[in-house]
Curated annotation (Swiss-Prot):
GO annotation (BP), single: bone mineralization
Cofactor(s) the record lists: Mg(2+)
Alphabetical UniProt keywords: Hydrolase, Magnesium, Metal-binding, Mineral balance
Record-annotated active site: 41 (nucleophile), 43 (proton donor)
UniProt-listed Pfam families: Put_Phosphatase
Positions contributing to substrate binding: 52, 133
Identification of the protein by name: Probable phosphatase phospho1
GO cellular component annotations of the record: extracellular membrane-bounded organelle
GO MF annotations, alphabetized: metal ion binding; phosphatase activity; phosphocholine phosphatase activity; phosphoethanolamine phosphatase activity
Catalytic activity line of the entry: phosphoethanolamine + H2O = ethanolamine + phosphate; phosphocholine + H2O = choline + phosphate
Length: 279
């Protein structure tokens, strides 16, 4: 990785201002006695590909025209994706077809086992949250299809809805000052503020551990908010993992959390079992 993000998100950006982007699952109101708080990314962490990329398969011939691809600008991916979604609608791709495409997204290896493990645990053990640069329609559609939505107490992502013309409309989650993250979301802000909010709601009682599972460079940002005793689960050999390794070589001891790389959700299950045995 040539472009280091070691200094990203060291000062608090603007607070999230998109309350509509936070979706409560069908699970009960938050319990204040869970011992562990676990965050999940969505693309290439829960699902084994980028959900936005899967939309290409819905286009005529399974490809996007060159003129459309040429409109992409670095740091403005969501704006580009909005043009893609408008194009799909113009080509007759319906909301039902988009949802069906999302439902076909395969889970990452071992993710069903990890989700079922967490669902089987008492509420006093794990509070589970999703933080993703995807959107509400994609994430909620997939979680509902797989039967995993009751596990997630909160979903923080870009708001989305189908308008009267059947076009999926996207909005940015929030604004921020992090120069390294996409303009629409800095996950470190979300994690930092959510943890602080929940600790206040718990009467000042912290979690025993905060856990973060992800894969991308934008998952490295929130992992920097973790403390000693917390655990980062980077997908092995993906950008998050490589950036953690890079930091370890350039600034030994700077990354505070324990690091457990994963290839399968089963790797995470094994670590969670050990944590439960020790606490």
């Amino acid at each position: 990785m040539r472009d280091s993000v070691f200094n990203c998100c060291v000062s608090p950006p603007h607070p999230p201002g998109a309350a509509a982007a936070e979706r409560r699952s069908r699970s009960p109101a938050p319990q204040n006695h869970s011992r562990f708080l676990m965050f999940f990314d969505f693309d290439e962490t829960l699902v084994d590909e980028c959900s936005d990329d899967s939309m290409v398969s819905a286009a005529p011939g399974g490809v996007l025209p060159g003129w459309l691809k040429d409109t992409y600008r670095p740091g403005r991916y969501n704006e580009y994706m909005q043009r893609v979604l408008a194009y799909l609608s113009e080509q007759g791709v319906t909301p039902a077809a988009i949802r069906a495409t999302v439902e076909k997204l395969p889970p990452c290896p071992g993710i069903p086992a990890l989700m079922h493990f967490l669902l089987s645990q008492p509420s006093r053990d794990f509070e589970v949250v999703c933080v993703s640069d995807a959107n509400t329609v994609f994430i909620e559609t997939w979680l509902q299809h797989m039967g995993f939505q009751p596990l997630f107490l909160r979903i923080f992502t870009n708001p989305a809805h189908f308008d009267d013309n059947g076009v999926l409309q996207l909005r940015p989650f929030h604004s921020h000052e992090c120069l390294r993250c996409p303009a629409n979301m800095c996950k470190a802000v979300v994690v930092r503020q959510y943890v602080a909010q929940r600790i206040r709601e718990r009467g000042g009682r912290p979690y025993q551990k905060v856990l973060y599972m992800g894969d991308g460079a934008n998952d490295f940002c929130p992992s920097l908010t973790l403390s000693p005793g917390d655990v980062a689960f980077p997908r092995r050999d993906f950008p998050m993992h490589k950036l953690i390794q890079e930091m370890g070589e350039a600034k030994p001891g700077e990354f505070k959390a324990s690091v457990v790389p994963w290839k399968s959700g089963e790797d995470v299950v094994n670590t969670l079992r050990k944590i439960l045995e020790r606490t």
